[in-house]
Structure formats: C-alpha cells, structure tokens
Amino acid sequence: MANPGALGSITYESEATFGVDTTTFATLRVPIVAPVDCSGLVHNKIDSERVMQYRNDGSTWILGTMGGSFKTKLDLAGHGSTTSGAVTLTGTETLLGYVIGNVAASASAGTTFTGGTATAPTTTASGTFSAGSIGFAGAINDARGGGQAFAVSTHATTTLNLLTALGGLPTNGDVCYSAVNIYPSEAPTSTTVTSLRFLLQTANLSYECHGCFPTAFSLMGLNPGERPQIEVTWAVAWWRYSTATFPSTVATETYNPSMIAGGSLFVNDAGTATRAARTFRNFQIDYTLGMEILKGPGGVNAYQDIVGCRRTPDKIKVTWTEDADAATTSPVLPGFGTATTSKHMLYTSATAAGARFGIYMPKVCIDSVAVQKVDQNLNRLTCSGMAYTGTTTTNDLTLSAFRMGWA
C-alpha cells in the first residue's frame, strides 16, 4: 500500500574507497527540505536488436549498468549556534565541504576586539584567525562591525589585518566571531573527491546509493527577503534496495536560517580594503561545479561502470542589480565594466549570530558593461563578473576563488 511521499530520510557516511560495499550510514540524517525523490536512479535496459523472422517479433532486453542521480535541498542555515566561543564543525558544514572541496574553522574560537582601526582592529586573542578566512564583527546597528562579515588578510599577534574594512572602529569588548569556511581547492593537483554513500528512505521503498559524488549545486534565495538554500545533485555509481528501519534514528540538525535581511554587499577594487557597500536589489551566484566521471573496470558491483571522479575547473559567475544612477556621464556600474581593474566582493546574508553566512570572492573580473533596463517598473542596472583564483598564494584558503563562512 502506498504511503505519504512527504515522509522520508537521507543519511550518509564517507567511503574509505570508492563505491565500497558497506552498509553504515550514521554520520548525519541530512536536514533536507524537499521530499526524497528516488526517480533519478537508473538500472539501464538495452535493446538486444536481435534479428527476428516475423514482422513484429522481438526479444528480451539486456540488463545494463546502474547509475543515475538524486538531489538534496538544504537551508543555508549558518552554524546553528554562536561562534563567539569554541567552534565545532556541524554535520551540514562537513557535508558541504565534501561538495565544494574543503571545510575549516576560521579560528578555533571567537574572541573580542580591543580597539584598533577599521582595517586593522586589535583582538584579545593572538594569531588565531587563518589567513583568507571569514569572520563576523559586532552587532547590527552598532555603527562599527554591524554584525557583518569580514575577510582576513593576516592575524599578526593581536592585530587582525583585514581585506575588507569594518564599518567603523571597533570598541573594546565588541565580539569578533569565528566562522566555518567552505571553499574549493585551487592547487592544480587537488582533483581528488571523497565519495560518499547515502541511504534514501521513504515510507515505502528504500535505496542504498554507493559511490556518490556531487556533480552540481545551486545557490538559491540570495535576494533580500528570501530564504537561502542550496540544492546539490549527487551522481550514483551503484545502488540496491534496503530494508533498514524507517523512521531512522540517526541524528540530524534542525537549524533555521535567517531570511536575507540586514546584510550587505561590499564591492571594491581588488586589494583595496576601504569599505564600499553597494545597495543591491537582487544578487545571484551561478556556480558550475567542475566534475568528470571516470568509467572503468574494478567496480565492486556487477553493474557498476563508474569507478571514480575528478575535479576540473569550476565556473563561478556573480550577478547583482542596483538602482540606476541619477543623470551622469560616469555611472558607477557601467564604469566597472569599462575599467580593467578586477574587484573583490563580500556578501553578508544576515546579522543574526548562528544563522548567517558570508561569501567572499577575492578576484572578480567584470564580464559585461551594464546598460539601464526596466526592472519591477524601475530603472536599474545589472552587473556581472566571473570569480577567479585569488592572488595570495599562502594556502588554498587565500587562493580560493569562492569561500563561504557560516557563523
């Protein structure tokens, strides 16, 4: 008898080797926000094309290889708790690290500001924030950090040198929040992928999916007033039915996101830390994940031809819309397009501690010259650019073309 399709569970674990036949899925019950859809799984059948003697005769079809895909849709919910103190990675952050490439805390714990300047505030802690990482400063409407994200150049003893200045000089005791950074690898040899196995459960059938890896993801709901989410597409090397107990008892996370409100968009010439916040109406990031499927022998299942995958270059495009300038011969956004200087950008989703995130892109090359258009009955300009590898070669984090900090 058919049961409600709204009921389901997806649990996972990382694999020791690609596609290994192991049946534990206890790392996390993924906090999905859309029903479990198994319809993308396939076990191919191939026409035998045998020559027959009668006009409409035929023969049994050949059983082919397994594969297919499924999707997981999650909220971009931030860290789930304050990062003013000690920081431990959550299960969702760890999962998204597998998707994009890496995950690491900016600092093992947050700290407090003691003074300094907007571009080089001083902190109680010494040398704890990683170069290239994201943090958050103060609270909304404090006229200083404002609860907004910042990007770190270096943390030299107690001086926190910033790539993106704060809104004002911090006051002694203002909170300096750590964050969890999710970012891609940039080294030319960093192409390996940790495969995962998932258990897709419904109130009827359940499926074990082995040799799983991300092939795409979409960032959604980044405009003011929207609910930020991410949807990941997972390829599957082989699968089988499961009779594992449902409902699952694997632990999950139920953190609610902040709506996109109270945040900011910093855009300035790359290398210039002076705060330059743009008043945006729409914001979008199109992240095309570079992933190549490897087919070959040696699979652990008789119907498995996918035996691995490798990362290839990603494509990261950022687009945002602003109101048109007053009459002028030098409007700002079109000037971004005609200039030859690359930008760096920092997006803050919201200001609520534990439910926000920031996105920093150290090198954005504008790919169009904005021309005025009518958008929602108002004159507006849309600017877009491609995010590329940063110029600071300290480590993968400083190089990363895209980094998301959850706090």
Which ranges hold each PLM region?
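Signature of extracytoplasmic/envelope-associated structural regions
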Residues: M1-A407
